[in-house]
Amino acid sequence: MEVLYSLSKTLKDARDKIVEGTLYSNVSDLIQQFNQMIVTMNGNDFQTGGIGNLPVRNWTFDFGLLGTTLLNLDANYVETARTTIEYFIDFIDNVCMDEMARESQRNGIAPQSEAFRKLAGIKFKRINFDNSSEYIENWNLQNRRQRTGFIFHKPNIFPYSASFTLNRSQPMHDNLMGTMWLNAGSEIQVAGFDYSCAINAPANIQQFEHIVQLRRALTTATITLLPDAERFSFPRVINSADGATTWFFNPVILRPNNVEVEFLLNGQIINTYQARFGTIVARNFDTIRLSFQLMRPPNMTPAVDALFPQAQPFQHHATVGLTLRIESAVCESVLADANETLLANVTAVRQEYAIPVGPVFPPGMNWTELITNYSPSREDNLQRVFTVASIRSMLIK
C-alpha cells in the first residue's frame, strides 16, 4: 500500500509541476525522485484485470530517465516526461480498479490482485517517499492489528431504519399512541404521538423512548440535538403493521418535555444530557438512548383547545420529536462518510465492470446491509478498498 501511495503521490506532483517554463532547480528533487521510481519499475512486467468485465492488460516498464538542465524545462523535455507520467498513471488506475474489484474472507486487508501483491514485494520498497496519508497510517496500524483512528464528518453509522411502534391501538386505528422513527446515515429522527394528546395519561403526560445500537463504537463525537423531527411534521398515510389496512397521521407539533439523551458503552452510561439542545459532545459510546415526553398543555387558547378535544374523533394528532445528528466523530473502523466519495468510487468501479458478487460484500455494495452485518472480514476488505480508492482519487477525478 505504501508503494502504491508513493507512486501516486510522485505522479501527481510530477503531472502538476513538470510543466513547460518551470525552472529545473525548482523541481530537481522531484525529478530525482521520479527517476528513482523509473529505475525501480524498469524491467518489471505486470498484469491487471481479468475479473468481471475488467479487461486483462499487460504492462511493461522500460523508460529512460529524465535528464538535467541548467535552464527552464522546454517543450521536448515536458513531452518526454508526460509520456512516461501518463503510462504510469494509467497503470496505477488499473491496479486500483483491479484491487477494488476483489475481496477475500481471510486476511482481506492484504493485497488481493496479482499486480498489487507484486508491488508489495521487497524490491519495490525503495519507492517509499511520502506516507503521511491518514488512510495509509491507519491501514498500517490495522494491518498490524493495532488501534486505529479514522476521523469522520457525518459518518454513515446508522443503517437505514424507518418504522413505528404502537403502544395503543384499535382495529379502526382512530386513537393511536406510539413512536415512529427514521434512522439513516448520521441522523436519527424520532417522534412520539398521541391522538388524544395524553388526555387519559397519568398527569396528562406520555413517555417515549428510542434506543439505537451502533455497529461500531464512536469516540469524541460532536453532535447536534434538536427538539423537533421535521420529517414527521406533515400528514401522511401509513401502512398498518400487518399490511391489512392504512391509517392517517395528521400531526400537530408540540415541544417535547423532559428530554434526556444518554450515550452508553457496553451498557454503561458515559454521557447524559438533560434538556440541552444544540451542540453536545459524547466521549465514547456504542448505544444512544433518547427519552422524552408529550405533555398535554395545561392552558390552551380556544383555537388550541379545539385541536385537542376531550373525546373522539381526534382529527389532529399531538406529536413531539427529536433530531440527533452526528456531525463528526472518530472510529477505529473505516466507515462510509457523507463528505467522502470512497464508497461511491468503489461501487462505481464494481458496477461499471460488472464485478460478480463475492464472498464478502453484498450485491451492489448495499451500505445498509453491509453496516448492519459489519463483520471483521467486511471491515478488513473495506479498509483495503477504501485506502486504494483514496490513492486512486489523487490521480483520477
Curated annotation (Swiss-Prot):
Residues binding Ca(2+): 266, 286
Transmembrane parts of this sequence: none
GO BP: any one term: fusion of virus membrane with host plasma membrane
Keywords: Calcium, Capsid protein, Intermediate capsid protein, Metal-binding, Ubl conjugation, Virion, Zinc
GO CC, any one term: viral envelope
Principal place of residence: virion
GO molecular function: host cell surface receptor binding; metal ion binding; structural molecule activity
Entry PTM: The N-terminus is blocked. Sumoylated with SUMO1 and SUMO2. Sumoylation of viral proteins seems to have a positive role on viral replication.
Quaternary structure note: Homotrimer. Interacts with the inner capsid protein VP2. Interacts with the outer capsid glycoprotein VP7. Interacts with the outer capsid protein VP5*.
Other remarks in the entry: The VP6 trimer contains a zinc ion located at the center of the molecule. The zinc ion is not essential for either trimerization or transcription activity of the DLP. Zinc-depleted VP6 has an increased sensitivity to proteases.
Functional note: Intermediate capsid protein that self assembles to form an icosahedral capsid with a T=13 symmetry, which consists of 230 trimers of VP6, with channels at each of its five-fold vertices. This capsid constitutes the middle concentric layer of the viral mature particle. The innermost VP2 capsid and the intermediate VP6 capsid remain intact following cell entry to protect the dsRNA from degradation and to prevent unfavorable antiviral responses in the host cell during all the replication cycle of the virus.
Name by which UniProt lists this protein: Intermediate capsid protein VP6
Species of provenance: Rotavirus A (strain RVA/Pig/United States/Gottfried/1983/G4P2B[6]) (RV-A)
